[in-house]
Structure formats: structure tokens, C-alpha cells
């Protein structure tokens, strides 16, 4: 097959390909009206395929978008600077080659591209390829992600596509718990976090020269770098905060990205984190139109309606001519049906792709807990905890709401109002179910009830010489993130969550006549 034997890496990316594993080169499979997904047929001729599937209503549009590029493999050899197609095949699986080609094609036209692949298709390697593209073009690659520990992941992906030599400017605050150092797969530090003093020097250099110093090749940072500043952003405009508050250091970071925007190719990993109504999101929506190129990556890119405006800035969505608020309202009204239509339209424009692993033939064995004693014990525990939920809800309704109403009457004369912060009223019950505290707490309760039986099952498999993987719906990082690696802690219980929920009922937000908001806790 003309290439070295290899296998897929753990992130779903390809390192060469297996002997005899051939991609099926055929037309997009025909489907019945009730078919949700069809096999993905790659435009790339790389024999190594991840054997993915694609939403049936996007398959034809994706194929036509790729056909407009033509020879995807030669296109990537030219744009990414590989020696030949076989060299490129060792870096990118056929699915990855297709999406990277589409992303580059859009970047060259000044448009954005959204990679919405699910876990197992290798979004990290695709992001690395876009860093390589920006570097080859002489632009500044800027990789923005959700967490610092993902810096190491992008380094490993860069190494996998042949670019381990690229030197990162690691633009992040010092954090003893969550290190920003880049490590290899064995945990060895390859690149240390750039020191605070050096970060300041490089930022000043970027503002003055519009490019990176010679000792750096690309930038890595996180979304929270842009969360706070002394300037407010809205509808493409900016103005200084009236109260003069805000982070000067955060504003400097914002100014730096704006200064280099014309030369910057920004890769937004976990791009749903870039959307929303916060200050950092407003800034990113301000700067995205100024960037040389932008690529978004997220399996849940359209997680909420307020995620969408940032994508509209550089895709065909902007042809609707709607303000951000209008777009959000339209998506709220249109729901899943409208989002599906929008995804089709983006795929037709060559600006969106979504694949996932084929789960055909995978069986799921549902284990029911049927021991009468265990069931009785769990029922008693559940009823007890739900009783505490109701106590907290009643406490807020009886005492906190009454206090807020009384304060509103007192403040009415000075045209100021006070209201319960979103997410705390009735312990979150009046919020969207998936964002409410009660939903998350019930999930924790159910996990706690099942954990012991799951552990027993896992121990039995271990005794049989089998390796196990235990998958959790939620890692509860918000409660465990403050603990250091290897630190001994007391066995956690639901009391921690219940206490946080109770404290949350005392949170309030106040707004004065100038429409300025402050938050705090009722004493």
C-alpha cells in the first residue's frame, strides 16, 4: 500500500495506516427516509480511514464542498509543505485530511470553518494541522483552548504531524494546581510555561512589531485570558468602563490580540467556550472579524443559542443580516429544527463538517440493581436527600425571596432594584433543566447511589484479569479542582454540594439607576 504499517492513536488520529485496511471509494450511500447517519466517504485517497459516519442530511453537501477543492491530497501537500502524499498520509487520516482541506480553503477566502467532529475523529490533530498551515504561510498561529492541560495535547498532536520543533509562546498565568507546562506522552516537560517577565516582554514586542519574536513560532493560551479588561465591547464597538474597574493585565492581552489580528490565524478549540454573554465572549466577537483567519473546533459548537453569533461573523450565517440578539432569539424559537437547517446550510457552504465513530455492532448491557436490601437502602438515601433539597427550596422561598422583595421596596425610591441571581432562585428549578443546580445535584445523587455497585463490578473484572474503563457523566471538577495532584483528602460526600447549594440561595445581584450591576451575599 506504499506506506509504513501503523495504527490509530488514542485521539482517533492516524499514524500511517494498517496493511490491507482500504477506504471504500464509492458514492455517498443511499439512505432511507428514516436513516439518521450514513458512512462517511472521504475525498482524500489516504487508505487509512477512521470508518466514521456523517449525518445523512449533510453527506451530499459535504461531498460537493470537497469536490470543489478537487485533489484534496495534493492540495494539502502544497499548503502544508509535506514532501508528497505518502508523507501527508502519515500525519492525517482520510477524514482529517478532508476537514483540514476545507478549513484551509475557507481561510484562503477569508471565511471561518467549524469542525464539529465527535470524540474519536481527532480534532486535536486537525487543530495542529491548522497551526502548521498558519506557520507555513508566515502568519501567527494562535491556539486558544479551555484549559491549560490541553497545551500538552496540542504539542503531542503537533509532534504526530511532524512539527514537534515548533516553539510555543505559552501565554498563561502561573498555577500550581493546573500546570501550563507542555509535556510529552510520558509526562516529561518539553516546554515550560513562559515566565511572567518574558510574557510581558513578548506582549510589548507583539504590540510594537505585529509579529512574534524569532524565538517563538506560535501562541497557546486559554479563553479566560480575555475575560476581564478595562474596556467593554458590544456590537463591534468598544468603550472604556465608566467605573474604571477591570483587569489592566487582561486588557493588555486583549490589546495584544487586536494588534496582531491582521497577521493572526486563530484556532479556537472547544469553541463553545468562546460564545455567550460574558465580557470575554463579547471581546472575542469584537476581534474575530479582524483576524486573518479563524477555525472553530467543538463537538458541541451549538451548545446554546448564545454560542451562535460568534460563528455568524465569518460564515454564511452573516448573510441573514441579523444582530446577535435577533439571531439568538430566532434560534430559541426555531429550536433543534432550525439548528439542523443551519448545519445543513453551513455544510453546503463548505464551512462545517461533523463526523463520529460508527457504533454499529456495539452492544450495551444494562445492569439493573435488583438486590432487595440494596434497593431499599438506596430508596431511603434518595428520599432523605430529596427532602433536604426541598428544605433548601422552601428556605429560599420563605426567607430569601421575602428579603429581596422588602429590599426592592426600599430601593425603589432611588430607582435601583435587587434580584436573585440566575441559577439560585428555587435552587435553579426555574432555569433550563440542564443548567440548573437541581439537575446537576440529582445526577450526583444517582452517581453516589450507583458508585459502590459499579466498583464491585469493576473489582470482579480485575480479578478475572481484565482491564476496565469506568466512564463518568460528570467529573465534578468544580468540587475537586482545588485539590493538588496526590493530595490526600477526606472521602467526599453530598453534604459539600448541598452546602454550596444552600450558600447559593443567599447570592444576589443589584442594579442601580445607571444600569450598573454588583453581586454579593445576603448577610
Predicted regions and their residues:
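Conserved Walker B
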Residues: 118-119, 270-272, 299
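Short hydrophobic/aromatic beta-strand immediately N-terminal to the Walker A/P-loop
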Residues: 112-118, 142, 469-471
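N-terminal pre-P-loop "Q-motif" helix
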Residues: 89-111, 446, 450
Amino acid at each position: 500500500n506504499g506506506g509504513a504499517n501503523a495504527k490509530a492513536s488514542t485521539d482517533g488520529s492516524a499514524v500511517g495506516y494498517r496493511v490491507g485496511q482500504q477506504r471504500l471509494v464509492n458514492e455517498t450511500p443511499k439512505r432511507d427516509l428514516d436513516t439518521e447517519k450514513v458512512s462517511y466517504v472521504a475525498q482524500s485517497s489516504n487508505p487509512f480511514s477512521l470508518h466514521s459516519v456523517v449525518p445523512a442530511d449533510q453527506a451530499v453537501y459535504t461531498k460537493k464542498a470537497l469536490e470543489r477543492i478537487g485533489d484534496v491530497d495534493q492540495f494539502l501537500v502544497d499548503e502544508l509543505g509535506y514532501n508528497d502524499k505518502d508523507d501527508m498520509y502519515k500525519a492525517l487520516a482520510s477524514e482529517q485530511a478532508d476537514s483540514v482541506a476545507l478549513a484551509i480553503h475557507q481561510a484562503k477566502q477569508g471565511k471561518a470553518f467549524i469542525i464539529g467532529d465527535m470524540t474519536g475523529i481527532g480534532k486535536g490533530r486537525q487543530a495542529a494541522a491548522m497551526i502548521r498551515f498558519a506557520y507555513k504561510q508566515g502568519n501567527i498561529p494562535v491556539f486558544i483552548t479551555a484549559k491549560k492541560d490541553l497545551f500538552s495535547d496540542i504539542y503531542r498532536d503537533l509532534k504526530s504531524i511532524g512539527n514537534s520543533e515548533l516553539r510555543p509562546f505559552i501565554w498563561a498565568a502561573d498555577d500550581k494546581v493546573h500546570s501550563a507546562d507542555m509535556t510529552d506522552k510520558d509526562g516529561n516537560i518539553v516546554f515550560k510555561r513562559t515566565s511572567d517577565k518574558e510574557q510581558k516582554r513578548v506582549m510589548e514586542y507583539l504590540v510594537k512589531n505585529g509579529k512574534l519574536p524569532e524565538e517563538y513560532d506560535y501562541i497557546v493560551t486559554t479563553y479566560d485570558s480575555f475575560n476581564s479588561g478595562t474596556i467593554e465591547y458590544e456590537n463591534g464597538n468598544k468603550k472604556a468602563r465608566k467605573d474604571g474597574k477591570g483587569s489592566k493585565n487582561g486588557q493588555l492581552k486583549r490589546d495584544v490580540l487586536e494588534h496582531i489580528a491582521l497577521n493572526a490565524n486563530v484556532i479556537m478549540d472547544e469553541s463553545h467556550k468562546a460564545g455567550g454573554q460574558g465580557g470575554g465572549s463579547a471581546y472575542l466577537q469584537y476581534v474575530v472579524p479582524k483576524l486573518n483567519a479563524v477555525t472553530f473546533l467543538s463537538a458541541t459548537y451549538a451548545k446554546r443559542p448564545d454560542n451562535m453569533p460568534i460563528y455568524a461573523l465569518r460564515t454564511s450565517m452573516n448573510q441573514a443580516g441579523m444582530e446577535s440578539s435577533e439571531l439568538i432569539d430566532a434560534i430559541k424559537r426555531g429550536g433543534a429544527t432550525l439548528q439542523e437547517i443551519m448545519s445543513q446550510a453551513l455544510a453546503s457552504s463548505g464551512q462545517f463538517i461533523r463526523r463520529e465513530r460508527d457504533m454499529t455492532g456495539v452492544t450495551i448491557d444494562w445492569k439493573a440493581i435488583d438486590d432487595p436490601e440494596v434497593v431499599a437502602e438506596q430508596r431511603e438515601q434518595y428520599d432523605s436527600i430529596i427532602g433536604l433539597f426541598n428544605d433548601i427550596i422552601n428556605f429560599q422561598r420563605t426567607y430569601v425571596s421575602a428579603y429581596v422583595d422588602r429590599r426592592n421596596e426600599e430601593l425603589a425610591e432611588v430607582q435601583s432594584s435587587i434580584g436573585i441571581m440566575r441559577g439560585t432562585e428555587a435552587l435553579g428549578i426555574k432555569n433550563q433543566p440542564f443548567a440548573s443546580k437541581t439537575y446537576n445535584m440529582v445526577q450526583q445523587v444517582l452517581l453516589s447511589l450507583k458508585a459502590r455497585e459499579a466498583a464491585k463490578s469493576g473489582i470482579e473484572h480485575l480479578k478475572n484479569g481484565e482491564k476496565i474503563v469506568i466512564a463518568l457523566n460528570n467529573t465534578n471538577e468544580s468540587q475537586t479542582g482545588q485539590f493538588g495532584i496526590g493530595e490526600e483528602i477526606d472521602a467526599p460526600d453530598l453534604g459539600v454540594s448541598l452546602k454550596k447549594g444552600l450558600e447559593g440561595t443567599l447570592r444576589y445581584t443589584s442594579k442601580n439607576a445607571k444600569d450598573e450591576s454588583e453581586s454579593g451575599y445576603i448577610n
